[in-house]
Every structure is written in C-alpha cells, then in structure tokens.
C-alpha cells in the first residue's frame, strides 16, 4: 500500500483511469444535446401533426398540410434556444464545482470530483462535501453529517478505520482518507446527484400545463375520429371529412405551449447567469417568485462574511498576556478554518510547536472548541465558545450580555486543569476573558430587504449566534420586527405559533433550523432559505427554495437552487423578478394557446352534431394562428412583467380564454345560420369564420398585452397589418374569398361587437363564479 503522505503516483493514476476506476459524476442541471433533440421532436402532438399532414398529402391536399411547417419552426426554435442556454449554463456551472484536495506523488493537488480515482488519498476539512466513499486513515476530530443520506441530523465522529460516504459532509475537524469505491460501485453517482437537487421539484406552471396536455391527449383522437366519421357520413366526401377533422385536431393542439414554458425558464436561467446567479433548479425560478417568507442566515447573508476582532474583556485573576498566549495556543492546536478562527489568528497568531494532547474542533451543534495542551506542571485545557454553552448551568455573564446588546459576537475563553475527553466539558472551568468580534453588514442588504418587505415577503433571521447580537445586526440591516427575538436553545415543543410571532431566532441548531422551516411550511407559507455554511444545508433542503453564496461551503452550494456567484445578495431581486416574469407572461401566453384549444374543442363537439362542413380548413387557419398565437407568444413570453403574480393561475388563464372562445363559438354559429339562410357558399362562410376568429384573437391579444408600451404597440401594429394583408393579398393561396361583398353585412357587425361580447360573457362567468363561491361558503 502507498504511504498516505505520498498518495498515488502519476503512473498508478493513469492505470486506474485506463481501467475506468474514475469517480463518474452525475449529470448536472442541463440535459445532453441528444436529450434536447428527443424531448422537442418526439412529442405526441408532433406525431399527430405529422400523421395528419401525411394523410392530407396522400389525399391530394398538400397545401392544407402547411401547419406542419409551423410545428417544425416551433420545434426548431425550442431546440436552438435550449442548446444556446445549455452552453451558457454549463460554462457557468464549471465555476461552481467544488474542488477536493488529494495527495499525488507526495504533493497536495486540487481535483474536480470527477477526476478522483480508486485508492486516491484525500484531505478532508470542515465545510467540504465528501465526494467518494472512503476509509479514514487519520482523523483529527473529524465529524460528519449524513443528513443527505439518512435524514438524521446528528453529527457522527469518525476515527481511524471508519467509513465515510459520498453525499455526507464534514462539519468539524479534518482527516486523511483513502477512496474505496468510485463510479457505479460508489454512493457518489446517486448521492452527489441527491445533494445537487434540493427537492424533487416540478414547476407549478409545468404541472398545470402538463395536466391540460394529459386531458387533451385523452380526448383529441376520439373527438377527431368521431368528427371525421360524422363529417363523412353527412357529406360523403372523404377528403372534406379529413380536412374538417385535421382543422379541428390541429386547433385543439396548443402548439409549443409546454415547449415555450420550458424555453422561458431556460432563458431566465441564462439571464440570471449573466447577472452571476447560477440556477441549479429551473423550477426554483418560479418557486422563488411565489415565496412569502424569506429565511436569512446572518453570516454571509446579512453580513458580508468578514469578522473583525474588537476587544478583550479580562476576568479577575487573568492578564492580557495569559489570554493572548491561551488563544494563540488554541489556534495552533486546532485546525478550525472558519471566520472566527481566521479573525482570532489575525489578532493573536497561532502558537506552533505545542504538544496538543486532545482537540475538540468547533461544530455548530456544540458551539465551542477546545484543546488540551502539555505545559510545565501538567496539561491545561482551553475552551473557546459561546458563553451560554461553555457555562450552560450559570447565568449569562453580565458583560457578555452587554456586549451582545451592542451587536458584538461574544466568545468566552475558559481554562481547566482536566484533560478533555470525548467532547465533554470539564467541571472545573474558569472564565479567563470575553472576546468581542464584529460583523460587517452588507452594503446592499438594507435596500434588498426593503425591496422584499415592499413585495409582501416576510423576513425571518435564523442564526446559530446569540439572539441579542443577531437582533442588533438585523435592526441595523433594516429588518422590521428585529426586536422580536427568541433564544432557541431554551425552546422545546411545537413551533407553530412561535415561528409566526418572532422575527429573529438565535442559538438555533441545524436540526432546529429545519424544524422552523417545517413549521412555516405547515402554516401554509412558501419558504426560501439562504445560507453559506454546512449548518444551513438541512434547512435549505427542507425549504421550498434554497440560495447559497459562492464563498460558502461546498455542501451549502450543492444543496441550493441558486448560487450567487459573486455573493452579491442584491441578485435575489433579479431572481424574484425573473420568476414573476415567467409566471405572468406564461399566464398570458397560455391564454392565447388555450383560446384556440377551447374553441376548436367546442366547434368539434358542435359539428359532430350539426350536419354541415367544419367551419374552416387547416390552410386557412395556419397564417391566422401564426399571427395571433405563434409569433406574439414568443415576444410576450420574454417581455418585462414584474408585478406580483396572482395565486389563481388556471383561473387567470380561463378568465381570458374562455369568454373569447365562447365568443368565437357564438360568431361562427351566427355565420353558419346566415350562410344557410342566404345560401352562401362554404368558401364564403369559412372566410368570414376565419376573419372573425382573427378579430377575437386580436381582441384577446390586446387585452393581455396591457399596458401597451411602444414595443408592444409596434408589434401589434405589424401583426394587424399582416392580418389585413392576408385577406387583401394572400387570399388566393390560403383559400380565402374576398371580404368586399354583401357578406360584410354579416361579419362586420360581429367584428365590431366582439370586444363588447367578450366583456359581457367574461362578466357573466365572473359573477357566476362569485355566486357559486358565496353559496359554497353558506
């Protein structure tokens, strides 16, 4: 076996790579190019479109198969946009990979997790995620948390010979380990993927839209087949029956709606990437827009993650020199690499050459660290930690409380003549001094918190620090209700009411953070947890949405939906706005698509009963669908629209599309009756039908585009001009008769009445719904 201070040689690594003994990593956020092609091409609706187009071509009606071109354009746009987005997101994801340290040829080298090979010797420190199954060779107080694997949040000490599993993360101490399993034989493939996905999330938008698709999938073929049969039986012409069925079925298909929703989410991810916010879960964009409680970790979120040593308060009987020597001795003995240790080493240094008999590294659950050091006259133990945890049975020192009220982070330095054992505090502890450190509030935090509060988002601060200190800093950052603080180390039992009544929660253990999030969710809130430390991971996993900082721990980044690549918390505003833009715009776009779906379904059902040809043929509706749905939907999906979304997503869609669809049905039945009474030709009737459908669609488009800015005004003008040109210049190609005839007496009154009729039907539906809800409550 190789010595662990040397690790593997270059030749040994080469042989293992050749043998495939490499730590294969799970696929990231973005799908492969092949999967993008398959997802966009192999859809049920594309298959239906292709089948109908082939039948029409065989029947000698290739011009009526033009709708297939629209489907191809939609599919191509979706593929191109997703491939471009994949390239951008993959490039940014590389920056977020958590490197590991390995010994190779006697040197410490930095590797990506995918470069680890069997038998590699890795160096593990607090805050890192374990990337491969391994056995401990040497341990200096290593403690790991296996919550991602088992759901249990207790920290587990690991000693020589113990196994550490990929997907767990180190919370205290350090160790040297040898990799025992990689690739398919390791937990790494499955559990690193588990760490990277916060929850099995699905976008609410996608769930709703896929539900609509499922319903359409069940009805579109039976309705189309029945319509074909009744049309054929009524007219006896198989080509005419096929045209009617094709027109109905292509109209019922919401061409590109699900694709456009996915593309919109992906475009938002790219937009956020340009603002240095890495999206690790596309549904998270939408989820954050619906968040009504934002839970903040103090360190690295409210504060910028830097600590400054401020002062030493000596206890009676101890000198400044003794305290300085004790802190320097502790810093030399411990390998803690957190913010507190960094600030103390900068002030007191780290004594080298001391013989550390036993060390207890800091952990967020224990809230203290310590070391037993051999000195003349026997061993001495030094403890450094939160006063309330170092002296749990005593009243808080008055000086400590005073410092906490001033916003300082306070540590208690204590000594004992008893050797430390198994991470338990000695009984003869004596307080030597209080050490005061200060956090720096982020310069952009007050404005960011003010923005969220103005948007109706409640802010909660959840921290492991003293509640008085946290309360002071929260107030300084402008968080309302910061004075309502609670010490969670004294709290047991149900948190349902406690979590609603308070703003600041101090002395919170990692498991309590999770319980607070659960309580908020149990009260009906949509939650977001921000953090940068290992102790935030469990809560971030529990929350509906998690946000981590790039300079935080690897475990926190892996468990989050978003990583702020510059640790600029104001980027949260852009994430919220992107989510709102997606929800609001897709609601508008869905109304356009479902208008077509609803009226095509209603007309299909009507003409299964009526013994007349279907109101239009596919060729006539292809340009109208492109001008009123296909083209404007792409522009609408990407416009700025940052107002707070409504909770009633489906109701919001139907509020627009159902009245418009019923207006289409009314207009076409009136025109059908006029055609029968005045013996109009089918070409005349279908031309008027298509014109009136276009007017209804433009009425809806204008309504959902409000407020109409210059950009939308130009778009609507161009689309309107193209619609007019269709009837003036393109009628022959698209089988449209002239509108300049006596038929104007039929279609013009309906066109003029359309906006008013939509409003009347919409008002009736709304009042009926309100009456229904009122009677339901009674």
Task: Identify what each model region corresponds to.
Residues 7, 66, 97-210, 491-499, ...:
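Cytosolic catalytic regions of P-type ion-transporting ATPases
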Residues 23-101, 108, 154, 344:
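Transmembrane helix-loop-helix hairpins at the membrane interface
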Residues 290-431, 437, 450-451, 459-471, ...:
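Cytosolic catalytic regions of ATP/NTP-dependent phosphoryl-transfer enzymes
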């Amino acid at each position: 076996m190789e010595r662990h201070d040397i690790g593997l040689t270059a030749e040994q690594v080469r042989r293992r790579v050749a043998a495939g003994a490499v730590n294969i990593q799970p696929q990231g956020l973005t799908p492969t190019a092949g999967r993008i092609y398959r997802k966009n091409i192999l859809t049920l609706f594309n298959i239906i479109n292709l089948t109908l187009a082939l039948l029409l071509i065989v029947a000698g009606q290739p011009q009526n198969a033009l709708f297939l071109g629209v489907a191809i354009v939609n599919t191509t746009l979706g593929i191109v946009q997703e491939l471009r987005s994949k390239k951008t997101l993959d490039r940014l994801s590389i920056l977020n990979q958590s490197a590991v340290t390995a010994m190779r040829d006697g040197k410490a080298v930095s590797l990506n997790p995918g470069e680890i090979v069997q038998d590699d010797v890795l160096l593990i420190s607090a805050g890192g995620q374990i990337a491969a199954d391994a056995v401990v060779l040497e341990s200096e107080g290593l403690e790991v948390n296996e919550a991602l694997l088992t759901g249990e949040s207790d920290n587990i000490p690991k000693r020589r010979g113990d196994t550490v599993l990929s997907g767990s993360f180190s919370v205290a101490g350090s160790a040297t380990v040898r990799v025992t399993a990689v690739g398919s034989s390791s937990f790494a493939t499955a559990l690193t993927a588990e760490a990277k996905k916060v929850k099995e999330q699905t976008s609410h938008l996608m769930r709703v839209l896929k539900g609509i698709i499922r319903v359409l999938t069940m009805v579109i073929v039976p309705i189309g087949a029945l319509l074909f049969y009744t049309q054929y039986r009524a007219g006896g012409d198989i080509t005419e029956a096929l045209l009617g069925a094709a027109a109905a079925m292509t109209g019922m298909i919401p061409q590109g709606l699900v694709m456009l929703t996915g593309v919109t989410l992906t475009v938002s991810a790219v937009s956020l990437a340009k603002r240095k916010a890495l999206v690790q879960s596309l549904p998270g964009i939408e989820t954050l827009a619906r968040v009504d409680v934002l839970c903040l970790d103090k360190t690295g979120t409210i504060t910028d993650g830097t600590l400054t040593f401020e002062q030493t308060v000596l206890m009676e009987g101890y000198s400044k020199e003794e305290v300085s020597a004790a802190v320097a001795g502790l810093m030399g003995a411990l390998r803690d690499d957190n913010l507190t240790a960094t600030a103390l080493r900068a002030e007191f240094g780290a004594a080298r050459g001391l013989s550390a008999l036993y060390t207890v590294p800091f952990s967020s659950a224990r809230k203290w660290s310590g070391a037993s050091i051999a000195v003349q006259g026997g061993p001495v133990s030094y403890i450094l930690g939160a006063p309330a945890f170092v002296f749990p049975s005593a009243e808080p020192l008055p000086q400590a409380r005073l410092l906490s009220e001033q916003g300082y982070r306070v540590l208690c330095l204590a000594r004992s003549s008893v050797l430390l054992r198994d991470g338990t505090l000695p009984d003869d502890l004596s307080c030597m001094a209080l050490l005061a450190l200060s956090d720096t509030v982020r310069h952009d935090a007050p404005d960011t918190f003010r923005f969220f509060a103005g948007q109706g988002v409640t802010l909660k601060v959840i921290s492991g620090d003293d509640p008085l200190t946290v309360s002071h800093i929260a107030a300084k950052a402008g968080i309302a209700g910061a004075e309502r603080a609670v010490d969670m180390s004294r709290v047991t039992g149900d948190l349902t009411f406690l979590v609603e009544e308070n703003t600041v929660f101090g002395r919170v253990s990692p498991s309590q953070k999770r319980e607070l999030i659960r309580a908020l969710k149990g009260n009906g809130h949509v939650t977001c947890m921000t953090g940068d430390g290992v102790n935030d991971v469990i809560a971030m996993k529990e929350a509906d949405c998690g946000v981590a900082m790039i300079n935080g721990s690897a475990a926190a980044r892996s468990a989050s939906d978003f990583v702020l690549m510059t640790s600029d918390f104001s980027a949260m505003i852009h994430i919220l706005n992107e989510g709102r833009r997606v929800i609001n715009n897709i609601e508008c776009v869905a109304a356009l698509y479902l208008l077509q779906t609803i009226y095509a379904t209603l007309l299909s059902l009507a003409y299964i009963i009526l013994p007349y040809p279907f109101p239009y043929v596919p060729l006539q509706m292809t340009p109208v669908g492109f001008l009123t749905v296909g083209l404007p939907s792409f522009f609408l999906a990407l416009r700025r629209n940052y107002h707070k979304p409504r909770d009633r997503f489906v109701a919001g869609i139907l509020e627009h599309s159902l009245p418009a669809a019923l207006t289409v049905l009314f207009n076409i039945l009136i025109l059908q009756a006029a055609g029968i009474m005045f013996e109009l030709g089918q070409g005349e009737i279908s031309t008027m039908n298509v014109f009136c459908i276009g007017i209804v669609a433009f009425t809806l488009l204008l309504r959902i585009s409000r407020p109409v800015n210059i950009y939308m005004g130009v778009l609507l003008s161009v689309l309107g001009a193209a619609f007019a040109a269709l009837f003036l210049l393109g009628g022959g190609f698209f089988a449209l008769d002239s509108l300049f005839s006596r038929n104007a007496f039929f279609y013009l009154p309906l066109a003029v009445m359309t906006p008013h009729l939509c409003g009347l039907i919409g008002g009736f539906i709304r009042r009926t719904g309100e009456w229904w809800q009122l009677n339901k409550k009674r």
